[in-house]
């Protein structure tokens, strides 16, 4: 196992993604400490000020410091991505493990439900859900989780179908292990590798979905997120392009970092795939 992680850290692309994500996480945690201005401080006299020594990435159309707002917004966007991916992963693991372990009619019903969610265009469904129930951070998280759990469910099911016939599972069953123990103590820990990789990629996907919803005007107006910043800067992009460029770059870096880390973890968990290539 140590050799596998050594391979991860020797892959400069994965390490680069990890460094970016750590920097973004630290920025989100200590945002109020490093923000030079109040993110909601309005100053008409400094409207649409270009980047300079005082305002590092300029101000927006209302005179608010873009850097201070982006630092605060990064926290919200990361939280949405992490929580939505976490909820999606938990639901997917539960559905996939039950489906793969028990099979039969339960597997048939759960997989048909999964297919229903996968048939409907996901972003369109997210727009409908948020429009119906309100543009709040909680509703956005729930909408994203509802759209992405089938990915984890199908992956978990395939892992369970592959692992439940292994000898160590049969030995535990003959030893009197209950179904709960077989699922959560014997099979699931050995199936977690690919699930962790997919969950990592879901964080970036959730952040992109939140940004897309916010860009369409469905973001939480009471919270500053990177997507909300893009939406608010859209009418003024011709003469205050920096107000859209910086939050857009933050979204790009966050999604890029999660994808690079996911690829690195995949190489650690499935080294033979890399060797075959």
Language model features: what each stretch is:
Residues 1-93, 97, 104-105, 119, ...:
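Gly/Trp-centered helix-boundary motif
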Residues 129-132, 144, 159-160, 208-250:
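Glycine-rich helix-loop "coupling/hinge" segments at transmembrane-helix boundaries
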Residues 64-79, 83, 103-111, 161-165, ...:
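Amphipathic cytosolic juxtamembrane alpha-helices at the membrane-cytosol interface
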Residues 24, 97, 126-131, 140, ...:
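Transmembrane alpha-helix boundary and packing residues in multipass membrane permease domains
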Residues 56, 60, 66, 90-94, ...:
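Generic hydrophobic transmembrane alpha-helix motif, especially the helices
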Residues 7-8, 70-73, 77, 98, ...:
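Amphipathic alpha-helical segments that mediate coupling or scaffolding at interfaces
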Residues 28-32, 126, 130, 155, ...:
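Structural signal for membrane-spanning alpha-helices in multi-pass inner-membrane proteins
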Residues 31-39, 100-104, 129-135, 147, ...:
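Short helix-capping/hinge motifs at transmembrane helix termini and TM-loop junctions
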């Amino acid at each position: 196992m140590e050799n596998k992680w050594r391979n991860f850290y020797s892959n400069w692309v994965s390490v680069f993604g990890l460094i970016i994500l750590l920097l973004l996480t630290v920025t989100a945690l200590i945002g109020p400490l490093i923000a030079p201005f109040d993110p909601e401080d309005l100053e008409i006299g400094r409207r649409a000020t270009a980047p300079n020594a005082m305002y590092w990435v300029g101000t927006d159309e209302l005179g608010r410091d873009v850097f201070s707002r982006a630092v605060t917004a990064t926290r919200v966007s990361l939280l949405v991505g992490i929580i939505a991916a976490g909820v999606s992963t938990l639901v997917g693991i539960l559905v996939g493990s039950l489906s793969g372990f028990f099979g039969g009619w339960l597997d048939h019903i759960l997989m048909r439900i999964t297919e229903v969610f996968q048939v409907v265009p996901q972003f369109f469904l997210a727009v409908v859900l948020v429009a119906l129930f309100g543009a709040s951070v909680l509703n956005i998280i729930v909408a994203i989780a509802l759209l992405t759990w089938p990915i984890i469910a199908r992956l978990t099911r395939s892992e369970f179908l592959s692992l439940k016939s292994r000898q160590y599972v049969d030995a535990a069953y003959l030893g009197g292990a209950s179904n709960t123990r077989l699922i959560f103590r014997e099979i699931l820990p050995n199936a977690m590798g690919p699930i962790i990789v997919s969950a990592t990629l879901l964080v970036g996907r959730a952040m992109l979905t939140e940004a897309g919803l916010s860009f369409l005007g469905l973001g939480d107006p009471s919270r500053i997120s990177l997507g909300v910043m893009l939406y608010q800067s859209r009418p003024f992009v011709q003469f205050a392009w920096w107000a859209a460029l910086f939050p857009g770059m933050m979204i790009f870096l966050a999604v890029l970092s999660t994808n690079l880390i996911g690829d690195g973890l995949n190489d650690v968990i499935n080294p033979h795939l890399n060797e075959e290539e």
